[in-house]
Amino acid sequence: DLPSNDGSRNQIVENAKERILKSRPPLLIEKKNIDLISIGNIEDDFYLVKEADWVVEAVVERIDIKHNIYEKIEKVRKEDSIISSNTSTIPLKVLSEKMSDRMKKNFCITHFFNPVRYMGLLEIVTEPVNDKEKIGILKSFCDEKLGKGVIICNDTPGFLGNRVGVYAIQVAMTEAFKMGLTIEEADAVF
């Protein structure tokens, strides 16, 4: 995260880490797993990216900010590390348009559904330039170690999950109107 302007430079993420422990429903399967989370900020600790085998970008959905982060990642990352975005809205082609070919081959979208602990679906969005072996390793890791149901998706608007979800909502609304249901009745049925 960004460094805090007052108090500890990691105050923002320290507070976020505390909120993880207090969240209901719980975000961690076991509270002791909180010790597996290392905190830091983007100014003082960015060099640590070089130690990661997989870097997941999850900043605000603004392409200028994402491109800035990718530029910084590319300068410090391991040559063979996998880089992904957790976006649910921005096309892969747009995210990767300013990347070197070297980084593009190891860049994809890993769209985790929220809340991540409880939602089993993970979409991995790829493009033809991706290193197929790396994508296979990522898919296996997410399936076997994270327990996700992984689907490989094309770079299309809404990917797969959101396209199906929006369609289901449209069908439910259309049927509710046809049946003359109230909002409460429609919510109970659909």
Predicted segments, located by residue:
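Rossmann-like NAD(P)-binding element
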Residues: 2-83, 90-94, 98-101, 121-122
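A non-catalytic, amphipathic alpha-helix used as a structural packing/dimerization or gating element
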Residues: 11-15, 19, 65, 133-144, ...
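Generic secondary-structure signature for well-ordered alpha-helical cores
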Residues: 18, 22-25, 75-78, 136, ...
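A short alpha-helix-loop-beta-strand transition element characteristic
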Residues: 29-32, 106, 133-134, 180-184
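Rossmann-fold dinucleotide-binding core
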Residues: 79-163, 167, 188
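Acidic, glycine-rich segments within the central catalytic cores of soluble metabolic enzymes
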Residues: 163, 177-190
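Alpha-helical scaffold elements that line and support the substrate/ligand-binding pocket
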Residues: 167-173
